From Swiss-Prot:
Name of this protein: Proteinase-activated receptor 4
Stored SUPFAM superfamilies: Family A G protein-coupled receptor-like
GO molecular function: protease binding; thrombin-activated receptor activity
Disulfide links within the chain: C161-C240
Length: 396
């Protein structure tokens, strides 16, 4: 599971090493002194002399406006080769299609069961919000899927591009923040069970959910305030978010995406690591009694780190070195890594909900239209476990 998720990071580094000093400097007026030739990833041009190397490497494919046309961007040949290759036009839509096909029914059914068949405990509210975030993420992907399948042609207009891009990032990072909130709730329940009786209430749970949603909305807000669609020079392609003017890269996109990666991913993952680390120590201290819960907790932590770390590391690397030649076209590796990150919304239902035998029984009872009384004994047992440190399901 780890290798496919780390592949975009390895791809980004290989792109940089393969291009070396032959990568066209996207900030300079490139003059060819020896002509062009085919490189490992497409046409490359040998540079005569870069005029400057002190500008930051941008987040997306950076383009220059065509003369007397503010709607059209020119991209270097190497960037166009990555933008129109098989990865963004075949692999990425396949991953998005998998998220829609699996994430919609899995999260929709889980949300239905949580809302109708599970006692309304504080942990239930957190898991319901997580299911909503993952469900909404799957719902906003079809426009992006159509865009990539059409060969990077956005047919829905500027406003739809802004909303779709902001919704993609907002719901994905909202899921990360809610995962951190769930880890805090489980830490209190398992490590401090007596104190949890006073702390784990509706007020704390509601506050955590509000903070997660408001933070995600704030982090995604810049994506709705600036233009995102531009025509690719020499083609009929209307790009959505994949190519942005050079003049806008450092002014607002750089700080916006640095904040998105740090506050929306690295800080929540750090909180999850601390909470689940303490939880794992508490479970390990009890020996084999809670071995299943121990393995499940480790799986939850590994899934979050493996899903979100590669794409956000690539995002930060874009700004880590002021020299454009340092990392090359890392955005070509970032696009598939972002698609891999969305797969977490398919994994969440199975490691948080369906892994529980009690939850599967509730799903079966609902699908078979069994009366609610058939699962009342299980509901009473779950409600009675509110003050315990461990219960057999994931619904703490």
């Amino acid at each position: 599971m780890c290798w496919p998720l780390l592949y975009p990071l390895v791809l980004g580094l290989s792109i940089s090493l393969a291009e070396g000093i032959q990568t066209p400097s996207i900030y300079d007026d490139v003059e060819s002194t020896r002509g062009s030739h085919e490189g490992p990833l497409g046409p490359t041009v040998e540079l005569k002399e870069p005029k400057s190397s002190d500008k930051p490497n941008p987040r997306g494919y950076p383009g220059k406006f065509c003369a007397n046309d503010s709607d059209t961007l020119e991209l270097p040949a190497s960037s166009q080769a990555l933008l129109l290759g098989w990865v963004p036009t075949r692999l990425v839509p396949a991953l998005y299609g998998l998220v829609v096909a699996v994430g919609l029914p899995a999260n929709g059914l889980a949300l239905w069961v949580l809302a109708t068949r599970v006692p309304r405990l504080p942990s239930t509210i957190l898991l319901m919000n997580l299911a909503v975030a993952d469900l909404l993420l799957a719902l906003v992907l079809p426009p992006r899927l159509a865009y990539h399948l059409r060969g990077q042609r956005w047919p829905f207009g500027e406003a739809a591009c802004r909303v779709a891009t902001a919704a993609l990032y907002g719901h994905m990072y909202g899921s990360v923040l809610l995962l951190a909130a769930v880890s805090l709730d489980r830490y209190l329940a398992l490590v401090h069970p007596l104190r949890a009786r006073a702390l784990r209430g509706q007020r704390l749970t509601t506050g955590l959910c509000l903070v997660a949603w408001l933070s995600a909305a704030t982090l995604a807000l810049p994506l709705t305030l600036h233009r995102q669609t531009f025509r690719l020079a020499g083609s009929d392609r209307m790009l959505c978010h994949d190519a942005l003017p050079l003049t806008e890269q450092t002014s607002h996109w750089r700080p916006a995406f640095i904040c998105l990666a740090v506050l929306g991913c690295f800080v929540p993952l750090l909180a999850m690591g601390l909470c689940y680390g303490a939880t794992l120590r508490a479970l390990a201290a009890n020996g084999q009694r809670y071995s299943h819960a121990l393995r499940l907790t480790a799986l939850v932590l590994f899934s979050a780190v493996a899903s979100f770390t590669p794409s956000n590391v690539l995002l930060v690397l874009h700004y880590s070195n002021p020299s454009p030649e340092a990392w090359g076209n890392l955005y070509g590796a970032y696009v598939p890594s972002l698609a891999l990150s969305t797969l977490n919304s398919c994994v969440d239902p199975f490691i948080y909900y369906y892994v529980s035998h009690e939850f599967r029984e509730k799903v079966r009872a609902m699908l078979c239209r069994q009366p609610e009384a058939s699962s009342s004994s299980q509901a009473s047992r779950e409600a009675g476990s509110r003050g315990t440190a461990i219960c057999s399901s994931t619904l703490l």
